[in-house]
A protein has these predicted regions:
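Active-site pocket-lining/capping segments in soluble small-molecule metabolic enzymes
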Residues: 1-121, 125, 139-231, 238-804
Length: 804
């Protein structure tokens, strides 16, 4: 069993030393731009270099996040930024953009690339593609399950998230914030609309339907280590240093215990910010958060309350007992009541209380532990009955002391090993060092003093005295394993000269160590070749409605998606009906026979390996029936690429050599589309979505849990502004897709886009009426100068140009 790397988030300079002291073996951080957490403090270039130097002295690796989609106009600046990071000694960069991977391989081939979780690498096809591109490590989606990870076969290192916030959507597959407020998660500016309450018609109470509990795999570290995971990652670049110190130190302690087969309690982790914990999809045990803010450690339930006293029945497993100055939160349905304990509470048994009429008290035994809280400091009185409420410990004074201790610890998880050798040369003191870093690199240094040894007037300096002075390491995070003193102890020199010699050597070792990670910086100039298309305009049409196939005219391609048989909000694992899929595609091919368009089977954008196996089986059977059909997929290896691939620059398009058509991201702006089309080697390869409901989220998390699924409800969410978001199920039965209820419509821009050089446009008719195919003619008329908005609104009553 290999103990994985512990990778900690660092959102500011202040957090770096905390992460190192707490036991991180690597950290990840971001510059002021191009990172997926733009609202963290983040680092200037000078601060990044300082952080890299500091971390390397402590044998801690530094990974810099450049994990946003990159616009055409940014490519050259980003590449020169990466060149500087490489020169500074960054151990790797985390990247989302396919085009950036291509450019790094070309211009900075020795810079290690880690594929960000934003790339949504959920299957072996994507891993194979990235391995061929020289990627060293892949951060797997948080949605991956233990068995799926176990079955992955790759030579790349695998990294998974084990702790922190969970996005409701697959990372990299969420356009909700972008389309609802212009702040793109793929550009690092997510406004977190998932943390708001939504309504579902048929269910009375609004709820945090899109807000999962935080992830914690603390109790599964042994299983993770046995999966040969190379790195475990803690989320939280925007969280406090208290969170960082407590979470990282607890995970370090737990990893160290793994070696001896022991386990440790996770209660302390619950006391720093969390929305409640679950194991997420790792063991398919996701839960919805009960509130948007901090929940804390659940300690029990209230069995009795009065104005100045609370009695809480403590959970049997609780070892963290609240103390004076700690904070409690009492939660009951949508109500909560928080306060600070002002007197030392008493822990006792029920023997000290009379059994009354309260049912909760009657259910207890006399040996049950109860916590009696006599007085509280409060900002307000409780406005609901506290009995039968859940009690959470949300603040722990003792933690502040532990955080302070970690801050001042000044140590690192792995120290470099130092061998010192002292000798005389022409009576001048000479000190040599051999420093072995954690990466097995050896650093050597030598310094010679200016003051010679002399015959003593009174007392000589002994070899033991010199050895004692050489043992002092000041601030340096080294571990001395051997000191050789080649001196007979008969001469004299001031001790201050020995100390000076030692300091000079340590300073030289520091410089040599830092220098050993550096590389040469080079200026990168990209070729911005202007290209043009052939001028012929073609339309594509997305559908999952066989009626559309009968009436569609004037389109070159039809992307056919198989609709789910069961479109409820309940999710089922691997619910694949192969006969249904075969029948649907076969019928579609029969209807399309003799039509002018090419029929293309659109696979789901999320395809875990078991689904790929099922889809390929369907394809094989169809081929035997002489019903072959080309494929649209997002697996980096197809003929037709959907907009879920987040294509935002010409380099990304050029990198997908096997694809005939690639759809650019729908969340870009007018100037971005102009920049892409002029710089792409083959503009006729680009397609652009101009009409339809955009997929805002793809998720493996349920919206409804338990008995909620038994109610009558409608398949859409409603936000506080009464906007509706239709919800549909993937053909896999394992994912839900949330669409925008307001359609994207670029009808008035279509002529401008054609003049820019775009020649392929797509219209999304999935889940639309039987006559939505008429939208094609509306757009063709617009290309001829006849923009008919009234006709558009017949089929698309609510529409927007979104970010365009």
């Amino acid at each position: 069993m290999r103990i994985p790397e512990l990778l900690a988030p660092v959102g500011s300079k202040e957090h770096l030393q905390v992460a190192i002291n707490a036991g991180a073996s690597a950290v990840y951080l971001s510059g002021k731009n191009y990172g997926a957490r733009k609202f963290a403090d983040n680092f200037t270039l000078d601060e990044i270099e300082e952080a890299i130097n500091t971390a390397h002295m402590h044998n801690v690796k530094v990974y810099v996040t450049v994990n946003t989609i990159i616009k055409e106009s940014e490519l050259e600046n980003v590449m020169n930024y990466l060149s500087k990071l490489y020169a500074m000694g960054a151990d790797a960069v985390l990247v989302q953009d396919l085009g950036l991977i291509e450019l790094i391989n070309k211009h900075l081939p020795n810079l290690k690339i880690h594929a960000s979780t934003q790339l949504t690498c959920e299957n072996h096809l994507k891993l194979d593609y990235l391995e061929a591109k020289g990627i060293k490590r892949v951060v797997l989606p948080r949605e991956m399950r233990k068995e799926e990870i176990k079955n992955l076969k790759t030579n790349m290192e695998l990294e998974i998230f084990v702790h922190g916030a969970l996005c409701y959507s697959y990372s990299g597959q969420c356009l909700m914030s972008s389309f609802k407020g212009g702040r793109s998660g793929n550009r690092g500016t997510c406004a977190q609309p998932c943390r708001q309450k939504y309504r579902i018609r048929g269910i009375k109470r609004p709820d945090y339907y899109l807000s999962p509990c935080d992830l914690s795999l603390y109790d599964h570290l042994k299983e993770i280590a046995e999966l040969n995971i190379r790195s475990i990652k803690i989320e939280g670049r925007m969280r406090s240093k208290e969170y960082l110190a407590i979470v990282v130190s607890n995970y370090r302690k737990a990893l160290n215990k793994l070696k001896s087969g022991k386990t440790t309690s996770s209660e302390e982790i619950n006391l720093v910010f969390n929305r409640g914990f679950s194991e997420g999809q790792f063991i398919n045990a996701s839960k919805r958060s009960v509130r948007a803010g901090h929940v804390g450690l659940k300690i029990g339930r209230v069995i009795s309350s009065s104005k100045n006293q609370l009695v809480i029945r403590l959970n049997d497993s609780i070892t963290t007992i609240p103390e004076r100055g700690d904070g409690l939160l009492i939660v009951k349905n949508d109500n909560d009541y928080g306060f600070e304990i002002s007197q030392d509470p008493m822990v006792t048994t029920l023997n000290h209380f009379k059994k009354g009429k309260n049912k909760q008290v009657k259910d207890l035994t006399r040996k049950d532990k109860v916590l009696v809280v006599k007085k509280v400091w409060q900002n307000r009185d409780a406005d609901f009955n506290l009995n039968e409420s859940e009690a959470y410990l949300t603040k722990r004074n003792r933690l502040a002391k532990k955080v302070k201790e970690i801050e001042n610890r000044g140590s690192s998880y792995v120290k470099s090993k130092l061998i010192l050798t002292f000798s005389l040369k022409n009576k001048l003191p000479v000190l040599k060092a051999r420093l072995t870093l954690a990466n097995r690199k050896e650093i050597t240094a030598e310094v010679t003093g200016n003051t010679p040894f002399e015959k003593p007037l009174k007392k000589s300096v002994s070899a033991d005295t010199i050895k004692k002075q050489l043992q002092k390491l000041d601030k340096y995070p080294f571990e001395i394993t051997q000191i050789n003193v080649n001196y007979d102890g008969t001469l004299f020199i001031p001790i201050s000269r020995i100390n000076e010699l030692r300091r000079n050597l340590l300073e030289k070792l520091e410089k040599e160590t830092i220098s050993s990670y550096k590389h040469k910086n080079k200026r990168i100039k990209l070729d911005n070749t202007v290209n043009s298309s052939n001028g012929t305009v073609d339309f594509s049409f997305y559908t999952n409605n066989l009626k559309h196939l009968e009436y569609l005219e004037g389109v070159k391609r039809v992307y056919l998606e198989i609709p789910p048989q069961d479109d409820s909000l309940s999710l089922k694992d691997e619910n694949y009906n192969l006969n249904y899929m075969i029948s649907f595609i076969k019928k579609a091919i029969e209807i399309s026979y003799g039509k002018d368009y090419e029929l293309i089977w659109k696979w789901p954008d999320i395809t875990h390996d078991k689904l790929i196996k099922a889809l390929n089986k369907v394809r094989g059977i169809l081929n035997k029936m002489n019903c072959s059909i080309p494929i649209m997929n997002a697996n980096f290896n197809g003929e037709y690429g959907p907009y879920s691939m987040n294509i935002a620059n010409s380099s990304s398009i050029n990198s997908l050599e096997d694809y005939r058509i690639v759809t650019v991201s729908p969340e870009l702006r007018r100037q971005d589309y102009e920049d892409i089309i002029t710089c792409t080697q083959n503009p006729d390869k680009i397609e652009m979505l101009v009409q339809g409901s955009v997929e805002l989220m793809k998720t493996r998390y349920p919206i409804l849990y338990g008995n909620e699924n038994k109610r009558n409800y409608e398949n859409y969410l409603i936000d506080s502004k009464n906007n509706r978001y239709p919800i549909h199920k993937s053909i896999s039965g394992e994912e839900l897709i949330i669409f925008d209820g307001i359609e994207l419509s670029l009808l008035e821009e279509i002529s401008h886009l054609k003049n820019l050089g775009y020649s392929n446009f797509s219209i999304d008719g999935r889940y639309k009426g039987d006559d939505y195919h008429k939208m094609v003619d509306i757009y063709k008329q617009a290309l001829n100068g006849n923009i008919n908005k009234k006709e558009l609104e017949k089929y698309s009553p609510k529409n927007t140009i979104a970010n365009y």
